[in-house]
């Protein structure tokens, strides 16, 4: 009998060890995006802050983007790099909490070689959370904020099945691309 492999990984944050899993999961997703960028990336989160994604203080990620230096790398910096090759969709709520991050993303986009690669959509009733790339869909209860990653009890699921990825992409396109 052959063992069935799964395309899905669930993580629940209630203690320090599972919070480390969430950080490592996000780190892995974004390192993969830096190496082989998706054509389109979707970040759908009611609340977003410019959280640290990569800890490059020891230089382990310096070969990816040498100009970053030995420090923590924030979400906006990763998206700014990815926007040169990919379209980045960000969907959020109209909340002052998001303003700083969204303005930073708009400024980085304007200063880039591909200013049209950032698409921001604001939805009053947004509660869905997800991060979607070419070959993954991270979904669950977690907002991409410090509290979402480090404080709150959350549950996330990383799904790599083509069916789930396609379903999420269709949903995001139908509901959040029309504002463009």
Predicted feature residues:
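PLD/PLD-like phosphodiesterase catalytic module centered on the HKD motif
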Residues: 1-180
